[in-house]
Amino acid sequence: MSFEHPLDPLSHAEQEQIVAHARKAWNLEAHHLFAMLQLHEPTKGELAAGKKIDRTARVTIWDRKKATVSEGLITTDGVAKEYKEIPGAKSPVSAIESAIALDVVCRNQSVKDALARRGIDDITTVHMETWPIGAQIPAHLDDGRRLIWTPMWHQPTPDANFYAHPIHGLHAIVDIDAEEVVGLEDNADVPIPQTPGPYRESQTGGTVALKELMIHQPDGPSFDVQGWNIKWERWSFRIGFDQREGLVIHDVNFTDEGTPRKIAHRLSIAELVIPYGDPAQGAYRKNAFDTGEFGLGNFTNSLTLGCDCLGEIVYLDAAVTEGDGTVRTIKNAICMHEEDFGILWKHVDVDGHTEVRRGRRFVASSIVTVNNYEYGYFWYFYQDGSIEFEAKLTGIVLTLADKPGAHHPSATELEPGLWAPYHQHILCARMDLEIDGGNNSVVEIESFAHPVGEKNPYGGAYETRETVLKSESAAQRLVDPIKSRFWKVINPNKKNHVGHSIGYKLIPGHTTYPLAHRDSVLGKRAGFMYNHLWVTPNVESERYPAGDYPFQHEGGAGLPEWTKNNRSLENTDIVLWHVFGTNHIPRTEDWPVMPVERTGFHLKPTGFFRRSPAMDVAASAAVDTSCDC
């Protein structure tokens, strides 16, 4: 796909150009790894000016010899704009480094001896994963080196579910850049669980089958795709893709009575962290920042028609740059389609006349696999002018071993001796909203009832209270279902037909609150978790809620640091950060593969339109001709 718009993701060819130019401009050698290569997105001002914009990449380089991170900007034409070292930063681990680390562990004699003591003589039957060590570093290794550690499972046959057979208490710690095992934790005598956990169709047979469900649109889908630009119903927006965040949405507009109206400049999920709540060996370090320490875009699946997506599908490919500078295309990285979504609205009048409209929604989605878990990111656009984000969590729960029936208060026993530790999935959406263009403010709205008396004579009356969140400290808020609390982003400079500021409201969905103590290692590193809402002025460099480089960072970066300045939020260009997620207490029904669990939020127009946009939806042709709809 050729370049058509400044917000288009960098293509395969463009990334190859960037890599070649960067090597030349910055004298990069084999020990310099491409940790991240991202589109350096133009500013709103640059986009509005309408002038030619150089295609520029933000490139993150890890120097394995010096153990330093450097960042640079460089264009597809080879113009290097800057290149600077980032003191104290450590880059995400690339797939190439993970492969090297695993090879180092597999060749280590101490690891082989430890496995042999457990009855495993063939190391090729051992599955290992590379996990960031976080900041839980043994004191003798806490000298600035870049470390990963390797949980292990036994895979007795090539098609066995290795997560059914955790090798408890055995972990290698690897210095990634020195390519050596610098620590071996071998401190448990728990037997390897032996009950298999088959899930492949060839193993389970799939005994419950339904009749085939076909989705057929004889005239094709109702959306139009031009490059990365999408038009559907009255919506228009751009799809983006980022090596760190994965699926991104840009430039969201809704046409109202013939006029396109801006709703958002950029929408993304800027971080995903999974705090594990089990202090057992093999669990307490598992607090991965899947976005910031791995780069979700790297793990994007190639989607399959009829399995991942169903209907009249249009796919978009994506490209990512590997650590050694090779560029990899991910076929069918993003899926787009329409879904019937039941009744949009309906009313039966007293004379029996029925008006009903079926609803439809546009779906843009991608799915990533990070070790044991799959995460589906789904953005939905509705005919009533609302937007929804839904994360679909599935895959295989992480497993540990303990004695059958043991007292293990922070885990669920799935099979005799096989345990799944309690954990949370905490996501942070970064939403650069632009309600009807221009500057915005944020209002908190709560419902309350007066005491029974003059204002509430019958005891059933209630009102709403609106509070403008004027500063960053005032805008650090929690969900409160008792007060039906929600937040509305308004444009105070534009009024609707009844004199109120137009806006969109954020409605939290299924959410949770972090159980890790604030002063814990994780609590410091993921300080953004402790508010469901943050609001900041829009600053280009403030992109990730835990900071740019969470790998082995001790904490304090990102939202907690930026908001110390307590900047004003009134009538300015703002960014909304929404923290949400799930508290996962595993069930036996989550084994061997977890059914999808959902979490997310809605953005709904509130005083933005004169009336319901759903009134403009045409009636569907009734299948039963005796029914008038």
Predicted segments with their positions:
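Extended effector regions of multi-domain proteins
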Residues: M1, Q15, T76-V93, A116-R118, ...
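Hydrophobic or amphipathic alpha-helical targeting/insertion segments
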Residues: K66-A99, D103-D113
